[in-house]
A protein has these predicted regions:
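Phosphate/dinucleotide-binding and metal-coordinating scaffold of catalytic cores
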Residues: 1-290, 294-375
Length: 375
């Protein structure tokens, strides 16, 4: 794929055109069709206006956050770069437009990019243990066997852990430095979160002969309606705020404010975000960065609701603190900070305390079981 323009679609609706500038930033303009009956695909950065939008932030290497959300993260990017290298293409020479063209219509969320750079064929999921071994081979810089197969199944995925995707499910494999029961741990965390009143997607353990099972989560950016798969437009907090998720630059105050604004002050949505904050603190999920919170657009109501919770597991960070601070405290937040965030968001103080105490109690066995986990 060579060219300096790319068209953006949502289903068969023409959203707009992206074009690369001389300094390798990617400008965007809505189509006339979208200006007549569309919505702001990024609520703060890209209002529905007849103008050319040029990103000023370098958080996403010249892209607006909404489009950067379509790109794969660490694991998917590794697969893309390995696949390009196998074809004699230097990854450093690739533009952001070309990387989006590789994503085509296979990315997370609802946006699709045309013309797509079709460089792989459809692949069927085979033996999961064999796929896991191939993933580990790639991480260890070894011969991985059928690279095209792995790319097709995981080249558009987010997150750092090896994974494969189908139209309805994401299946995760342990990374090389993880214990083999990482799947059972994440399943336990998601089950506990549901018990804590947090909305989570359907999950299950896929059978394995070499570990206790591979964690599988049902995709919430896809919805089956009358046998048809509907793609749902969603954005991460990083994309909405145009911030680099790899830096700890966010507080739960911000997430609560975002939820109030995006959901049009929906009290249930606000309580969901509060519950997730309490769970992350009490269950020691410190990898709570800005790409681990997403909102899904409701076109009928013209508002955004928090997506089901995801990536809930025992985790730490290299700096030993939460990626998202709690009332300014990232190292050891507790009840005081949680209640302060709830109060600032306008929640009932008594209700906040009841929720926090309930989640603390429900996470005791879970947190103790996995204390000291090396992630």
């Amino acid at each position: 794929m060579k060219g300096r323009k790319l068209e953006v679609y949502l289903g068969e609706r023409f959203v707009g055109t992206m074009a690369q500038t001389a300094d390798r930033r990617v400008a965007f303009a809505y189509s006339e069709e979208w200006l007549d009956n569309g919505f702001a695909i990024s609520p703060f950065s890209l209002p529905v206006e007849q103008k050319v939008f040029v990103p000023t932030s370098q958080a996403f290497s010249g892209l607006w956050g909404v489009f950067a959300d379509s790109l794969p993260d660490a694991w998917g990017q590794l697969l893309v770069d390995r696949m390009l290298k196998a074809r004699g293409i230097l990854s450093a020479d690739m533009t952001q437009l070309e990387r989006l063209a590789i994503v085509g219509d296979s990315g997370m969320g609802a946006l699709a990019y045309r013309p797509a750079w079709n460089i792989q064929q459809d692949a069927a999921i085979g033996d999961l243990d064999e796929l896991s071994a191939q993933c580990h081979a790639i991480l260890n810089h070894e011969d991985a066997g059928d690279l095209d197969e792995l790319f097709q199944m995981g080249g558009s995925s987010g997150g750092a852990r090896p994974k494969i995707m189908t139209d309805e499910w994401i299946i995760k494999f342990p990374a090389s430095d993880e214990m083999k029961d990482s799947g059972t741990m994440e399943k336990a965390y998601m089950d506990c979160a549901a018990d804590c009143g947090i909305i989570v997607p359907e999950t299950k353990l896929m059978p394995s002969d070499v570990c206790a099972g591979y964690f599988a989560v049902k995709r919430f950016d896809r919805r089956k309606t009358d046998g048809h798969i509907e793609r749902r437009h969603m954005l991460t907090a990083a994309a909405i705020l145009e911030v680099d998720w790899r830096t700890a630059a966010m507080d739960y105050h911000t997430l609560m404010k975002l939820t109030k604004i995006l959901s049009l002050d929906n009290r249930e949505d606000l309580e969901q975000m509060y519950r997730r904050m309490c769970f992350n603190v009490f269950a020691h999920n410190r990898d709570d960065h800005a790409k681990n919170f997403s909102w899904i657009y409701d076109e009928q109501m013209d508002c955004w609701h928090p997506s089901p919770a995801y990536d809930l597991t025992w985790s730490t960070t290299y700096f030993g603190e939460h990626s998202t601070t709690v009332d300014g405290n990232g190292r050891n937040p507790g009840m005081k900070e949680l209640l302060a965030v709830g109060k600032a968001a306008g929640m009932n103080a008594k209700n906040c305390k009841v929720i926090a105490e309930e989640i603390w109690e429900k996470t005791r066995t879970l947190e103790a079981t996995y204390q000291g986990w090396k992630s």
